[in-house]
């Protein structure tokens, strides 16, 4: 049998056979790599050897960064080598900072975006897209008709003072009366919203459509006996462009666990 002295022991046994203190860390640079060897105790209170290999690379940094790297260390880290010490320094992930600009620059950016929006304009609904991409190209509203007003007879100075004139035929400072305005009402900017919840209220409808632009009239259909919503409503916008935007956004939009169906309101047959 070979003698016990001839058996080679491992490096861990050799380290444990020492006085009990950890050997100092060593650092070797060769072939463009830095090899750092350290000794420490693990969870089981055993000495372990940790070898770290770093690749050396040269980068160009700003002068302020180079000046910070040349600052002398102090305190408990006065004797540390250049670079972070893993026992006292934890390298975390990079945090990117976002600088907030002043309001004038933000306003300039918004004005630039608004000018870009006016480059493309649909001839059908005046939306911000090409005419052949318009979703309402083949609908009944692809060519909106101008509201026709009934001709108002001219009043002369020779008319009799006691003659009766219907209200809708009267003129006030060159403007048609109330009756003529109602007969010439433009419904081309009205939309119909379907598949609404029974709990829908006028306040909810106002909150739903007010972000698309000003409107002149809203009608929420309700049941006469129960007072609940019948499931549809009409909204008249001042601008047909705002109405087209509302249709594009709300059609297929999920609201109150239901999918809304929004379309152009069909014009009523003249009576």
Swiss-Prot record:
GO molecular function terms listed in the Swiss-Prot or TrEMBL record: RNA binding; translation initiation factor activity
Broad class of where this protein is predominantly found: cytoplasm
An example Gene Ontology biological process: formation of cytoplasmic translation initiation complex
Residue ranges constituting the RRM domain according to the UniProt record: 189-267
GO cellular component: a single term: eukaryotic 48S preinitiation complex
Alphabetical keyword list: Cytoplasm, Initiation factor, Protein biosynthesis, RNA-binding
Pfam families: eIF3g, RRM_1
Alphabetical list of PROSITE patterns matching this protein: RRM
Cellular location(s): Cytoplasm
PANTHER family cross-referenced by the UniProt entry: EUKARYOTIC TRANSLATION INITIATION FACTOR 3 SUBUNIT G
Family recorded in the similarity comment: Belongs to the eIF-3 subunit G family.
HAMAP family hit by this protein: eIF3g
Record note on quaternary structure: Component of the eukaryotic translation initiation factor 3 (eIF-3) complex.
Function: RNA-binding component of the eukaryotic translation initiation factor 3 (eIF-3) complex, which is involved in protein synthesis of a specialized repertoire of mRNAs and, together with other initiation factors, stimulates binding of mRNA and methionyl-tRNAi to the 40S ribosome. The eIF-3 complex specifically targets and initiates translation of a subset of mRNAs involved in cell proliferation. This subunit can bind 18S rRNA.
Protein name: Eukaryotic translation initiation factor 3 subunit G
Organism the protein comes from: Anopheles gambiae
